[in-house]
Amino acid sequence: MDYKSTLNLPQTPFPMKANLAQREPEQIERWRTLDLYRKVRSRRAGRDKFILHDGPPYANGEIHIGHAVNKILKDFIVKSRTLSGFDAPYVPGWDCHGLPIELMVEKKIGKAGHKVSPAEFRKACREYAAAQVDLQRREFIRLGVLGDWENPYLTMDFRFEADIVRALGRIAARGHLAKGAKPVHWCLDCGSALAEAEVEYENKHSPAIDVRFAVVDEFGLMARFHTADGALGEGPLSVVIWTTTPWTLPANQAVALNPELDYVVVQRTDIKERLVLADALMKDVMLRCGAEGYRVIGYCKGAALEGVQLRHPFYDRIVPVILGDHVTLDAGTGAVHTAPGHGQEDYAVGQRYGLAVDNPVGGDGRFLPNTELFAGEHVLSANDHVIEVLKERGALLHEARIEHSYPHCWRHKTPVIFRATPQWFIAMDKGELRRQALEAIGQVQWIPDWGQARIEAMVGNRPDWCISRQRTWGVPIPLFVHKETGALHPDTDRLIEEIAKKIETAGIDAWFELDPAELLGAEADRYGKIGDTLDVWFDSGVTHHAVLAQNPDLAFPADLYLEGSDQHRGWFQSSLMTSVAMSGQAPYKAVLTHGFTVDAEGKKMSKSRGNVVAPQKVMQTLGADVLRLWVAATDYRGEMTVSDEILKRISDVYRRIRNTARYLLANLDGFDPALHLVKPEDMLALDRWVVDRALAIQQEVIEAYETYQFNTIFQKTHHFCSVDLGSFYLDVLKDRQYTCKTDSLPRRSGQTAMYHIAEAMVRWLAPVLSFTAEEIWQYLPGQREESVFLSEWYDGLFGLDENSRCDRAFWDQMLKIREAVSKELEILRVRGEIGASLDAEVELFCDPPLFRKLSEAGDELRFVLLTSYATVKPAAEAGTDALPTEIPGLELKLAASGKPKCVRCWHHRHDVGTHPDHPELCGRCVDNVAGTGELRTFG
């Protein structure tokens, strides 16, 4: 007789093959039709809010793997907080102004003011940015990120542009805005100032020269030194500086020494000259300039030389010796050539001494026409000419070439220069902004915690923030400045609000096309209209004002900012500075940073290396859920390694999780929780254990989501699927589910456990495997919401009774016993003595405590151990042939069963053949096929 029809074989329409590349877009369309984001918002209305504020990516080009990581991490958090019952809106945004867009538009239509008018150019920039936003939006949605994609914030929206202007007005009103000719990073290709965040450091080869600055009053200088024998020495007397930027020497205004360092006068005996330099660097200098003989004839501290007059090496100019703590012994001579127009430290020390801020270099990088000797030359090619002039004047002591770290433009990858130009700044020490910012940093949670020290160091040492740019596509600095005094218009607050209203209606063109007389009337002739634009870091830096404070769904300050670790010097810092300047507090309660993506060898990704992993390709082949699972599996706090091979391994894990879910669904066929759910107290011991195990996992998973430990969620869920379920529970349960009567308590108990597990696990997976979880959700039995994202964490799990004999400790020991038995079964299998584990019988010889415990299971112990017989006996009955185990008080005997095999359950039982109507079945199967069904209480 064929007994297959009497078995409860699993079946489900849930597909085994994920086919994510095809199914995921269908799911996205379903979410769109459902208007899922709005439904979630409606369902969570009135709940406690959790605000993750989106840092705006730049609207230029397709998204890369770093974008994908960032948006996926944010999605994990927003969805998990939603499942925790929070109202967690997610409003994405884009950064839309700035140079990269200008460069792309220039390629198409030419430069503003040349082939097209500035207004036409800005219009083209706006259209280009809008197209890029649409491109990136589609790709972010394809990743499965849920958000208000229909209503993102764009820094180029008229309202946003107006709010940027209002933010600037408030910062100015609070006294943090300053104007000055200060040295700033200047990109010769951009033709504009750069912010700190726009500068990258790369290695560069530069000339390194030692230059003599002749002393005006040699006798007076020597009088400041302590000389051993009163000897003044002989030959010309010079202070020696060392520089890697010879082109800055035309702007030299002083030579700086460190007041605390020891300086010496060195008498060269080979060419009869005297050189002043730092004692600690003397040997290095003498070695590199090839001095064949020298001796020290005088000592003093740097402080003793303040005010000494020196001759400029090639101009008819006297320059003083000044003092500064920035002078170190890291390299050079201990004497620093000081050009306040070409360096921030030079500028700072120059301000103390009232030095001129001389800048002989134009915005194109060429010396101005009135620059003696070098007029019209480009600074980067003028080094050789400067060196030639120094040689001619006898001022060059030594020249060499070195490789060193040098600032480059982040966009053009070309060297930048420091150049003093009239710029607008947010002053770090005006109104105690730096101190307030450092205090605010201490009130924020930084994840990982090293982020706090990093941003503190940056804020503590940063110069004033140059917020002005000389660009076309950007938000204006809408100020009127008195043409004679340089003072801001006294009614600036009101004027800024008037201008903001105009921008809110007509965009930034409202300022650029404004006739000043329209606002200033008769005063217009006395005031200049500023034509500069704002640094785009200011645009994104005031999203706390333009988005958080304006959007009724959001709130200020945000609960969390989350970006890459480079944003400590970028968005985190610009947001902090503007927020503190405007309101005296940080715009975020917590800041989380993630590392950069690298290939399997830890190398940066680049097209030239051929190691780029494009998220678009991954989604088209493996699916977005595999990419999302990789993000969850990777420790985001450091570098995130990704490659095709790594993603293939992640795909294997995905299949294990999917197959586990499919098996649960298949075994829930015919189960209706409204009719068949078994009460906890009536469930079998093994089923109560697995629900308790799921409860413990759920508690760990929720805590991991709350603390952003996503790799813990990956590990816990994967282990639960592969070990707790796959290698144990489902393996044991299979016999009961297949062979017991369909509506029997043992089978419904197992289905109840699997139902609870599936309900819980689909929610654990939802923030990470969003597409797959939603697919599972549609196949789960029982009434439910339209989407898993409209639900909350499952509350149907329950723990084991602490007073039960089958408590967690019991099951921990049971798992160890099963492992010990399985180990010996494998040996029998390898020997060829058995095929499957059910071909074996096992005797367990136990000490009294273990004997009492295992006796609880009775004959059902065999089901847990997957053997046809499992007999518990006292340890005293173990013979010398019993096998020891690592479990105290347990020895084993295993052997192939000699009893007949039941064709239905495949157990070898003594009672097979004893029933005349079913001679091929064991007694248990006869009960299940023709009787009232077997009874089970344990497993």
UniProtKB/Swiss-Prot annotation:
Classification via InterPro entries: aa-tRNA-synth_I_CS, aa-tRNA-synth_Ia, Anticodon_Ile_BEm, Ile-tRNA-ligase, Ile-tRNA-ligase_type1, Ile-tRNA_ligase, M/V/L/I-tRNA-synth_anticd-bd, Rossmann-like_a/b/a_fold
Quaternary structure, from the entry: Monomer.
Function: Catalyzes the attachment of isoleucine to tRNA(Ile). As IleRS can inadvertently accommodate and process structurally similar amino acids such as valine, to avoid such errors it has two additional distinct tRNA(Ile)-dependent editing activities. One activity is designated as 'pretransfer' editing and involves the hydrolysis of activated Val-AMP. The other activity is designated 'posttransfer' editing and involves deacylation of mischarged Val-tRNA(Ile).
UniProt keyword list: Aminoacyl-tRNA synthetase, ATP-binding, Cytoplasm, Ligase, Metal-binding, Nucleotide-binding, Protein biosynthesis, Zinc
Species in which this protein is naturally found: Methylococcus capsulatus (strain ATCC 33009 / NCIMB 11132 / Bath)
GO terms of molecular function: aminoacyl-tRNA deacylase activity; ATP binding; isoleucine-tRNA ligase activity; tRNA binding; zinc ion binding
Record-given protein name: Isoleucine--tRNA ligase
Domain text: IleRS has two distinct active sites: one for aminoacylation and one for editing. The misactivated valine is translocated from the active site to the editing site, which sterically excludes the correctly activated isoleucine. The single editing site contains two valyl binding pockets, one specific for each substrate (Val-AMP or Val-tRNA(Ile)).
Annotated ATP binding sites: K607
Cofactor binding annotation: Binds 1 zinc ion per subunit.
Positions that bind L-isoleucyl-5'-AMP: E563
Motif 'HIGH' region: chain residues: 57-67
GO biological process assignments: isoleucyl-tRNA aminoacylation
Enzyme class name: ligase
Main location: cytoplasm
Motif ('KMSKS' region): 604-608
Cofactor or coenzyme needed: Zn(2+)
Superkingdom of origin organism: Bacteria
Family affiliation: Belongs to the class-I aminoacyl-tRNA synthetase family. IleS type 1 subfamily.
SUPFAM superfamilies xref list: Anticodon-binding domain of a subclass of class I aminoacyl-tRNA synthetases, Nucleotidylyl transferase, ValRS/IleRS/LeuRS editing domain
GO terms under cellular component: cytosol
Localization per Swiss-Prot or TrEMBL: Cytoplasm
Reactions this protein catalyses: tRNA(Ile) + L-isoleucine + ATP = L-isoleucyl-tRNA(Ile) + AMP + diphosphate
Enzyme Commission number: 6.1.1.5
